[in-house]
């Protein structure tokens, strides 16, 4: 471990989702991170609520298809640039090596920079898939074929909507997206950011 580095503690969070699914998350106690040592930047863009409303209104006017998906464990995909060390999680410490620590390479929930690391990874992946990021809202991505926007992707942390006039193209794009991340395909979107979609 590098000199001057602090070891961050962690804890388990147990949760029951609205659908009854039981989840467990390992959460880093990021409040103990030191700015300038453990992280520099923490801001990560999220889609503006007004932009979501506008995009859904345009989709409604154009009679577009709207498909949803949920990216599982999003922050675990964000590659870290900083050196972060964490204590071994309770119940997973290696017997006889409890004094050793883990060097984190990817984000975990609770890290100050986890959201930014995920967004940077997502942004690069979307560009690799052929999307362009909207300049006015960094969580709206446009996919064009023959100069015409064919799919609009709206991403809010781990939730995404894919909207467009052609369901076949949307499904192709969704399938390509899901090759990059472990996702739960929600099919035709019924809800996004607590808004009902009909």
Task: Label the predicted regions.
Residues 1-198:
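Long, low-complexity, charge-biased intrinsically disordered regions
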């Amino acid at each position: 471990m590098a000199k001057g580095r602090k070891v961050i503690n962690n804890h388990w969070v147990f949760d029951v989702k609205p659908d009854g699914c039981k989840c467990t998350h390992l959460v880093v106690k990021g409040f103990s991170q030191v700015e300038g040592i453990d992280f520099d930047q923490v801001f990560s863009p999220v889609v503006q609520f007004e932009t979501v409303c506008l995009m859904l209104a345009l989709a409604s006017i154009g009679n577009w298809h709207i498909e949803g998906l949920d990216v599982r464990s999003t922050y675990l995909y964000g590659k870290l640039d900083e050196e972060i060390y964490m204590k071994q999680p309770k119940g997973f410490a290696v017997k006889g090596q409890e004094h050793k620590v883990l060097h984190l390479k990817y984000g975990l929930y609770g890290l100050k920079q986890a959201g930014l690391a995920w967004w940077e990874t997502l942004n690069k992946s979307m560009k690799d898939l052929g999307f362009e990021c909207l300049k006015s809202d960094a969580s709206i991505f446009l996919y064009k074929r023959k100069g015409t926007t064919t799919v609009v992707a709206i991403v809010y942390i781990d939730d995404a909507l894919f909207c467009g006039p052609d369901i076949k193209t949307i499904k192709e794009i969704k399938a390509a997206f899901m090759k990059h991340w472990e996702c739960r395909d929600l099919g035709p979107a019924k809800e996004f950011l607590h808004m009902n979609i009909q």
